[in-house]
Amino acid sequence: MKSLSILGSTGSIGLSTLDVVRRHPERFSIAALAEGHDVEMLLKQIDEFRPSLVSVRDEASRERLKGMLGDHKPEILCGLEGAAEVAAVDGADMVVSAIVGAAGLVPTVRAIEAGKDIALANKETLVVAGQLVSDLVKKHDVKLLPVDSEHSAIFQSLVGHRTEDIERIILTASGGPFRKTPAEELKNVGPEQALKHPQWSMGAKITIDSATLMNKGLEVIEAHWLFDMPAEKIGVVVHPQSIIHSMVEYIDGCVIAQLGVPDMRAPIAYALAWPERCETGIGKLDLTKVATLTFEEPDMERFPALRLAFDALKAGQTYPAVLNAANEIAVAAFLDKKIGFTDIAGTVDKTMQAHEAWTPITLEEYLQADKWARETARQLIG
């Protein structure tokens, strides 16, 4: 029996994780849950999975939840410190890190320091503080298992192979809803259109990132830290059908890929059960029905966010943290209809140009870069 703590239990990844847990009560149990916005959903999760500890967004949500509890009454904490306590709770073997954005960094670090294995859905943790997190994973001898479908695919495609035999890793991208949209029309795109992803069901922030290709850019940086690959050995190819989730090319010219229907329960289950596998409830892949798999180069002129991410990775230091923070502010502004679609990458670019980078060492220094970028991006947006 593996006991789990879930950071972001009421979000898309959290709900999919609990669906896997629900299917395997003999394999998984829930020690603690942290949510951000949906107290009613958390109440249902408490009744079903009976965690000993939960955390909510703020004190008002804490008091509200306290008055709604049934016969099972877990300890209720709130805020960032509450999420960090959920991450480090005694009795949990693994922490599913699925809080959206850089907010997931501190709780994930706390989990690693507490000796927990990590199922990482929060890519921003590695984007913002990849060197720090990688060092902590080694220091505390914990496992860092990818939940992103692309990184799970690479992880699976690397099994049994030597690092020195890798030619490159290839991340696939759906291309988003605007893959065929002319550049001059992109500036008129609204949130309603951008939130319609052609293949995946995800939260709002990651769906917008997928539309700008920033999500793929963040995944490039994540792949660098997960697999110790330089930027020059990480490629991106647009694959609209989202059947091949990513690939590894080896020095002998062979390419190994992982295929499956696009459903996040598959990579989640792989991370939870690793090195074993478990049933997920997703449909079986029928290649005769898919019939055609197509590929194309990403257009970094129409979607400059991907280029900016490669630039940040190559520049290193605090640039990836600044890229991520500015993007979070810009995406929120776009969803609030304060800026246009093409202004998202524009805001990130201007923030990066204004940044004087340094080499961060401590968690506080990474967070300082994050804070600076958020303030600068807000000023640029006005």
Curated annotation (Swiss-Prot):
The keyword Oxidoreductase applies. Keywords: Isoprene biosynthesis, Manganese, Metal-binding, NADP, Oxidoreductase. It catalyses: 2-C-methyl-D-erythritol 4-phosphate + NADP(+) = 1-deoxy-D-xylulose 5-phosphate + NADPH + H(+). Its cofactor is Mg(2+); Mn(2+). The keyword Thylakoid does not apply. One of its GO terms (biological process) is isopentenyl diphosphate biosynthetic process, methylerythritol 4-phosphate pathway involved in terpenoid biosynthetic process. Mn(2+) binds at residues 148, 150, 219. NADPH binds at residues 10-13, 36, 122, 124, 203. Its EC number is 1.1.1.267. Pathway: Isoprenoid biosynthesis; isopentenyl diphosphate biosynthesis via DXP pathway; isopentenyl diphosphate from 1-deoxy-D-xylulose 5-phosphate: step 1/6. 1-deoxy-D-xylulose 5-phosphate binds at residues 123, 149-150, 174, 197, 210, 215-216, 219. One of its GO terms (molecular function) is manganese ion binding. It is an enzyme of class 1 (oxidoreductase). HAMAP family: DXP_reductoisom. Catalyzes the NADPH-dependent rearrangement and reduction of 1-deoxy-D-xylulose-5-phosphate (DXP) to 2-C-methyl-D-erythritol 4-phosphate (MEP). Belongs to the DXR family. This is 1-deoxy-D-xylulose 5-phosphate reductoisomerase. It comes from Chlorobaculum tepidum (strain ATCC 49652 / DSM 12025 / NBRC 103806 / TLS) (Chlorobium tepidum). The gene is dxr.
